[in-house]
Every structure is written in C-alpha cells, then in structure tokens.
C-alpha cells in the first residue's frame, strides 16, 4: 500500500512475508575497486648500510659544540676599536722636544725634571701596557676557541640535518612494512616515489605487500593501486521473528555484498562467517536462532523506517496528507516515511527524527592554514642563527662591560676600597657623637642658685 501526497511527502506501508527469522534490507551502495595498477618501491639495503656506516664515522670524528659565528665577528670588531684608541692615547715622549735636548746635552733643570717625570710615567704605562697585552692575549685565545666552536658547529648542524632525513626515511620504510602486514598503504612512501593514480579518494583502498629479493639484497614494497571503481549494492541482515517466535541471533550492523562468489563487508573485507555468507548467497543458513519473549514488536530499521511483527490492530497517526488522519494497520508491516511524520503507540517516526535540534559548536579553534612551507637545510641554519642573536648580544655586552671596567680600574687609579673606608669612617664618627651625647644627658646640670629653706 502506497499513499503519496504533494510536495514529495510520502508514507509507504508494505507487508512482510518471510518466515526465515531475519530480513534482508537494502542499504546504500559502496564504491569498490574494479582494476588495479601494481607498483613496486625498491629499497637497496646495501646502500642503507653504507649510509649508516658513513654517519657512524662522522659522529666519531665531527662531534662538536654549536656555532657562535655572530659572537666571534662582533668580538673582533670591538677589540679592534679598543686597541686603536689606546694606541693613540699612549705615545712616547716628545721626539722633537725633550729627546732632542737630551741627546745634545742642552737640557736644564726644568727639562730634567720634566723628562724624569715622563720617563717614570712611561715606565708605569709600560707595566700597564704589559697587563693589557695579557688581557688582549686572553681575549684572543678565547676568540680562537669561539672560531673553532663555530667551525665545528657548521659541521654538526649539517650532520644532524642529514641524519634527521635518513632517520625519517628509515622510519617511513619500517612503517610501510608494518602496514603491509595488514594490507594497508603508508602514505608517507609517496614522499620517495610519486604515483600518478594515488589521491585522497582512493588512498584507503590501496593494498600493499612486502617482498625481499635476497639475490640483490633489496626490499620490495608492492602497492596495488585502484584505478577504476564500480558501485555495488549492499544489504543488511535484520533479525526478525518467524511465525514460531524465533529470530536470528545476530547483533552486527555491517552491510554486505557478493562478488566473484565471495562475500565482503562495506569496507571491502572478505567475510568468512558461514552464517553470514550463506544468508547473502541465499543458501541454507547455518546459524543460531533465539526465542523472543514478547507478543508484538515495533522497532527501528533506519531513522525513517520501522517494522512491526504480530501487531494487533493499531491506529497510526500521520501528517503526510497535510492532515492528521489515522490509518489502521495490523500484523507484519514495514513502514517508511519521506518528508513527513507518523506516530504509532507513542513511537514517533520521521525522516528528520535523529537530526539535532541544537547548534553543535566544536570545542576546538579551527586553524587557518593557507600554505605549508617545506623547511630546507638553509632555513634551519637561518632559524638557528636568529634564535641565537639575543644570546650573542647579551654575551658581547657583558664582555665589553667587563673590559671597560677593567681598563677603568687600571688607568684611572680608582681604588674601590676608598669608598668603603670612607663609609666606615663616617659611621664611626657618627657613633662617637652619639656616645658623647648620651654621656651629657646622664650628667646632672649644676645649680646656679642653691635652694634656701623657708623661714617661718
């Protein structure tokens, strides 16, 4: 019985004439690969061993600290500026004046005193200059270590980058081998061998297997890539009581189809369950059945479909005819509605029954990714240099401050202990003044006018 109305609203009621203990219900079709392209990815195990030995040798000889090139160049420029300034300020005695007089014996007493003072100053400056040279030598040694540090850093950065790429390649191959045991394809293998017929739609349908060629010491990962697909109808198995009240003991919700005398589920996996395969092939099922303990049944098959079993005459309310006319139904029925709603024994059936009535907002923040950039070796070095700039500037500033402080203390003849001594001396004087004031408060003042007793 089919009742249709305008605007696509429809209610369909059909009799169920079966006595098997189950129903076969048509489900949506699935897309199944019909032809494949076979591809082989060859991995030379001998070459991998050679590369592994190369990295082992590099790690033994080239393991050094990270680079500090920026700090080294900065220190070179600052040191050149400091040496130039001190060389201009620290000249010897006047060659045209005092030395000329001394050589020819024309100096007088004033000249002698002036020359002696300059010679003493020059001797003192020579001592200071020797100490400065020691400091400069120490700095030069440190900068030489920094330069060696930088050279070794370039080597280790290159080594780490190459080792990272090689390790990632080995991990991808290993994952491909593990997934091939399950017949699955590792998408990361596409990084090493681009395949024309592989896309996001069929990548889950790619099957793989792993082989080893002992003669050439090669590992072969063979991919079966689907290039053509076909639509195949599927069916669901629905337990439904027979006339004696027994139904199939079955709880699965998968859909099945038959191809080349084999049964597969909707994920294209072969089914070996004899009960399921016989039902799909319309053979005599070898299954377990169970007794039901109810007089009648009303249950959902899909959001817009229900079935009834042994139903007594019942009134069905519906709005599929733009009115709420009741329909009397009885027995074993399958009821399906389209763009309308029915109600039977307080059970509401609608095509939109299971659609949410509230707005579900995701709890995560969507990521606006417009482009993914591949990071290259040069980019990695640049990022490392940029991240180290702050550290380099800080270290350079500290070293310059220490050098300036050293020069200031040496050549300005500033004694940092004088201020400490002055503070201690001032505090001692304040303590003495306080003690004298306390003693004065304890001594009683003299009486200028002695008291005279009163006479009566």
Curated annotation (Swiss-Prot):
Glycan-linked positions: 44, 151, 228, 310, 368, 388
Keyword annotations for this protein, in alphabetical order, are: Glycoprotein, Transposable element
- Superkingdom of source: Eukaryota
Query: Using the chain's own numbering, where are the disulfide bonds?
Result: none
Q: Which residues cross the membrane?
A: none
| Membrane found in the keyword field | no
Q: State the name under which the record lists this protein.
A: Retrovirus-related Env polyprotein from copia-like transposable element 17.6
Q: What is the lineage of its organism?
A: Eukaryota, Metazoa, Ecdysozoa, Arthropoda, Hexapoda
